[in-house]
Structure formats: C-alpha cells, structure tokens
Amino acid sequence: MSYNLTDPYEIARYIKEAKKSTPIKAYIEGDLSNCDFTNIEKFNSGDLYILFGESEEILVIIENNKDKIKNCRIEQDRRKSAIPLLDMLKVNARIEPGAIIRDKVLIGENAVIMMGAVINIGAEIGEGTMVDMNAVVGARGKLGKNVHLGAGAVVAGVLEPPSSDPCTIEDNVLIGANAVILEGVKIGKGSVVAAGSIVTTDVPENVVVAGAPAKIIKEVDVKTKDKTKLLDDLRK
C-alpha cells in the first residue's frame, strides 16, 4: 500500500496501519537444539546462540527452555515502534554515530548529519547540507542545498498538529545554534537566522533575522557572508 507522505493525515494513517515492532537481540548460553526458530534470525556455535527477532517470539523460546538455559542477556532499543530507521547504507552522505533518522527520509549527496541529530519521517535534506549536533528536523521539514542547521536548532514538524504547509529552508541558508523555525515557515535563499532566534513568519531572501520573535536586522552583506561561509572539506 502506498502513502502520500506530503500529507500529514496520510503519514498518520501510515503510522496507524504499520505493524508495530519490538525487536530484540538475545544472547543465550544453553541447549536450544530442539527449538523452532521460524521468523527468528539465529547464529549459534554449540550452546552459544545469538537471536534476532520480535520480542514475543524470542521470549517464548526463553520461557519454554529456561531449565536448559545457563545464561541469557537481552538488548532492546524500542517498543511497539511503527516506523523503522533509515537504511543508511543506501545514502551517499556522512552520517555520524548517534544520529536518529527515520525511514522515508530523503538525504542528498554529500550531506552531513552529526551526532545526536534527529530527522523525522518525510523530511528532505538537500545536497551538501549539514544538520549539526542535536538539531531536529521534524516531519516533512525541507532543507535545500548547502544549508547549515546549527547545533540544537529545530525545524518544526507538521504532523501533530497536522498542517498542509511544511517548514521550507531554501538553499544556502544558515540557521544558528538553538534557533527554532516554527511550523509552516519558509526561509528564503541565502538568509541567516541568528542563534537562539524564534522564527514565526516567513523570511525573504538574503536577509539576517534575530530575536524572539525574529525580525529582519539587516541584509546579508560581504561581512556576513564571510562569517557564515561553509567549508567544503567537511562535505567530502
């Protein structure tokens, strides 16, 4: 079944209808030679087993064979999860450890996703764009090419409450640390959002905004461009 991920109600329907998953990893020492491992990925040597699968299936095996098990350790990182994480092997970008990127996200060539960044379903990250440490791109947020989203900054999602207009950050925009771009706001090409700003209305091209709520304080000039230039070496 296909879903229109530009529509917040379709995303909500996708989450509702998705099979919820609680995958676990189990490390077991014991005799499980007579067990049925259907739907479970199993690796073993002798009495040592590593199992990957849904919690309800693996826990049944553990419970039914507890007298044969010497040691057991279980690892899990989610419960009743509706959306898997993105398969990063298919992305030609630099993605650092600790970034959380949900499936159905588009990431452009040579983008950089730093530690602790969170990118939600339906978001788009343009070519050469950096999402810095602990920054958040909410559902359906759109970042153009060569954008810098500063550490701790937030591009609000438009899933709940639902909105038809996502946040749009156009090409060559720099958003300072801990800035917040509210739902549906558009930031024009080449503009700069000062650190800590709260942007509540659309921003035209090639201006600098600052404050809470953010207001235009000047046009982008040579000095501003020099202070906010990106480093290509970070994107190689």
Curated annotation (Swiss-Prot):
A Pfam family hit: DapH_N
InterPro entries to which the protein is assigned, alphabetical: DapH, DapH_N, Hexapep, Hexapep_transf_CS, Trans_hexapeptide_repeat, Trimer_LpxA-like_sf
SUPFAM superfamilies reported in the protein's UniProt record: Trimeric LpxA-like enzymes
Superkingdom, taxonomy of origin: Bacteria
Enzyme Commission number(s): 2.3.1.89
Gene Ontology biological-process annotations: diaminopimelate biosynthetic process; lysine biosynthetic process via diaminopimelate
Catalyzed chemical reaction(s): (S)-2,3,4,5-tetrahydrodipicolinate + acetyl-CoA + H2O = L-2-acetamido-6-oxoheptanedioate + CoA
A GO molecular-function descriptor: tetrahydrodipicolinate N-acetyltransferase activity
Keywords: Acyltransferase, Amino-acid biosynthesis, Diaminopimelate biosynthesis, Lysine biosynthesis, Repeat, Transferase
Nucleotide-binding recorded as keyword: no
Primary enzyme class: transferase
The protein's annotated pathway: Amino-acid biosynthesis; L-lysine biosynthesis via DAP pathway; LL-2,6-diaminopimelate from (S)-tetrahydrodipicolinate (acetylase route): step 1/3
Similarity comment: family membership: Belongs to the transferase hexapeptide repeat family. DapH subfamily.
Role description: Catalyzes the transfer of an acetyl group from acetyl-CoA to tetrahydrodipicolinate.
Protein name: 2,3,4,5-tetrahydropyridine-2,6-dicarboxylate N-acetyltransferase
Taxonomic lineage of the native organism: Bacteria, Bacillati, Bacillota, Clostridia, Eubacteriales
Protein encoded by which gene: dapH
